[in-house]
């Protein structure tokens, strides 16, 4: 399901992530080229973020991507449109 697609994953406690779905087994999801969606603006929900992207990229807080991450508490996986993927990837890297 959605393997090799760019997706948004919501974890029960770990948060929200966007990346390329490498594998899924139960509640464990492995993403590559992954960004944590620490704070978003310009989309009403992560569903809207997956469909249209952000209308306010300058307000979003997405740290730098990591090569690979294993999310052990995935409760939602939403495939992204090409426009949404481009929008998420275009957000400037946020650092503290």
Regions found by a protein language model. Name each.
Residues 1-96:
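Conserved RNA-binding domains used in RNP assembly and mRNA/RNA metabolism
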């Amino acid at each position: 399901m959605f393997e090799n697609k760019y997706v948004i994953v919501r974890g029960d406690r770990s948060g929200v992530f966007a990346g390329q779905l490498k594998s899924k087994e139960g509640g464990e999801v492995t993403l590559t080229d992954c960004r944590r969606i620490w704070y978003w603006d310009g989309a009403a929900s992560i569903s809207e973020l997956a469909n249209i992207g952000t209308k306010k990229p300058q307000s979003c807080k997405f740290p730098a991507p990591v090569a690979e991450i294993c999310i052990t508490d995935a409760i939602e996986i939403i495939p992204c449109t090409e426009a949404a993927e481009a929008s998420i990837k275009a957000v400037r890297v946020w650092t503290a």
